[in-house]
Amino acid sequence: MGGKYTNKQEITGADEARRAVREQLEHGADWIKIYSDRGYIKQPDGNYRALSNFTLEEMNAIGSETIGSRKNFAAHAMTRDGIIAAVNAGAKSIEHGLGMDEESMQLMAAKGVFWCPTLFVNEFVAEGRAKLGSPINLMFSKSIPETFKKAVKLGVKIAYGTDIGGYDWSLPQAKDFSYFVSWGLTPIQAMQTATVHAAELLGQVGQIGEIKSGALADIIALKQDPTKNIESLQNIDWIMKDGKVYKQHK
């Protein structure tokens, strides 16, 4: 919801916001995703800003309607302008967030909001978008290592994720784990972003993200030990999903 994005539902006003949430939930949505901000710039002081896609009334209406229906919402938000409004409205996850500032991080940490950084997609699109006249993703690439380190230090919870589009899906989606490790997480902590942390974010603790009796049998097998070589996650030899083998290296 929000902004002129293909196949997205636009709203104007709090009543339309509530109606849009209800419509999506009637279609069976478990989560609502909103596009919280747009038009990113880097200021002379090094901070990033953006334009908000929603008024506070619209944002709060989305949050209250979603949470009141016992569902959750995630926000595509790059800077404090989209992040703070979304978190205060009840967002459970901030998607991308590459231009977040310290106040955003502190608020997210205090409220237990997850950050889904989607680092590889930014790296993938940065050069191409810069050639087309939009260098903001290159700027994010330069600042994100310190942003990530600060967020971890301040206690922001990290969840692994990809994106709905923007890059070649045939490329290894596990590159984010290498970024996580190079910027301070241990290999175990990096893998937990896609297991126990993801389960917590999705409200499925005990069902996914761990190997134990009663949980879904979602298991992968590798030739190398990822605690010693995190890049081995980019070459998965065997995949089981809910007890069914989908990939078996011959």
Feature locations, PLM:
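Active-site environment of divalent metal-dependent phosphoester hydrolases
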Residues: M1, R38-Q43, A77-I84, G99-E102, ...
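Divalent-metal coordination cores built from histidine and acidic residues
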Residues: M1-K71, Q106, K111-K131
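Conserved beta-strand positions in the central sheet of alpha/beta enzyme cores
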Residues: K33, S93-E95, C116, A221
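His/Asp/Glu-enriched, well-ordered alpha-helical/loop segment
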Residues: G68, N72, S141-D225
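Structural detector of well-ordered beta-strand residues that form the stable sheet scaffold
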Residues: F73-A74, E95, F114-C116, A159-G161
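Glycine-enriched alpha-helix->loop->beta-strand junction motifs that scaffold or abut catalytic
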Residues: N88-S93, A109-W115, G155-K157, L185
